[in-house]
């Protein structure tokens, strides 16, 4: 994402992702990296990208901050419920219902999502999560959303039907689907997923890797 000229990366998983073979992680440039949790398919390229972007700031829950501060990265710790103002806008860390560990299975803190409140738009990035009633707190505590980025692959996270309900909970009409088709456990039927959203008057956007959109 890009807000106020700053490039924000979330959960970088490129190496080992068969759908992203056209992307060279060594060529990625960013100003911030936001991590929702520590699972391998969300941090696979973190250290390479951080090395190539030494001024980039890693933002995550306390345990993620502690792990990567020890590795020499610039970090900013957050925890759920808190806001912090960055140079592109302010961000709130919010609840996610999932698990979180580093690749060595050590504790990576609690999984989380983020709400980005910026002059260019308001975006909710849920991270990996199940449907939760806590999502109803987002429109009560945050500005109206322009876009929600929600997982739809089922098995490890919400499926499209639950994600469409999540879109109702957070009061957002445009949803960018994520966490689907990367491997066999989370392959989906695209038409069925789109129908789950359209039946609730919501738009589901299924982008190809390397694509871009404006909101």
Annotate the PLM regions.
Residues 1-9, 14-18, 92, 174, ...:
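Zn-dependent metallo-beta-lactamase
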Residues 2-38, 44-52, 99-105, 129-143:
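Pre-active-site segment of Zn-dependent metallo-hydrolases
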Residues 2-8, 83-91, 117-123, 215:
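Beta-strand-turn-beta hairpins that frame and shape the catalytic cleft
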Residues 9-11, 30-38, 57-61, 124-129, ...:
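Active-site neighborhood of phospho(di)ester-bond hydrolases with catalytic His/Asp-centered motifs
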Residues 16-17, 39-44, 65-67, 82-85, ...:
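Active-site environment of divalent metal-dependent phosphoester hydrolases
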Residues 44-52, 56-102:
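Glycine/small-residue-rich loop that forms an oxyanion/phosphate-binding "nest" at active or ligand-binding sites
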Residues 57, 69-82, 164, 168-215:
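Binuclear metal-ion centers of metallo-dependent hydrolases, dominated by the metallo-beta-lactamase
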Residues 102-168:
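Active-site-proximal loop/helix segments of hydrolase catalytic cores
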């Amino acid at each position: 994402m890009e807000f106020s000229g700053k490039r924000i990366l979330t959960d970088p998983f490129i190496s080992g992702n068969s759908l992203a073979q056209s992307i060279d992680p060594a060529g990625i440039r960013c100003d911030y990296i936001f991590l929702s949790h520590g699972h391998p398919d969300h941090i696979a390229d973190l250290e390479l990208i951080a090395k190539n972007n030494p001024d980039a700031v890693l933002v995550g829950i306390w345990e993620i901050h502690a792990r990567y501060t020890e590795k020499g990265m610039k970090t900013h710790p957050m925890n759920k419920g808190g806001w912090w103002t960055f140079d592109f806008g302010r961000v709130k860390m919010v609840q996610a219902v999932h698990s979180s560990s580093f690749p060595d299975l050590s504790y990576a803190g609690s999984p989380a999502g983020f709400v980005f409140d910026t002059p260019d738009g308001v975006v909710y990035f849920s991270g990996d999560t199940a449907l939760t009633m806590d999502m109803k707190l987002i429109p009560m505590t945050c500005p109206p959303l322009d876009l929600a980025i929600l997982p739809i692959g089922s098995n490890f996270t919400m499926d499209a039907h639950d994600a469409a309900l999540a879109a109702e909970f957070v009061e957002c009409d445009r949803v960018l689907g994520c966490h689907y088709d990367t491997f066999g456990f989370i392959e989906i039927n695209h038409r069925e997923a789109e129908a789950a959203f359209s039946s609730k008057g919501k738009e589901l956007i299924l982008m190809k890797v390397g694509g871009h959109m404006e909101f």
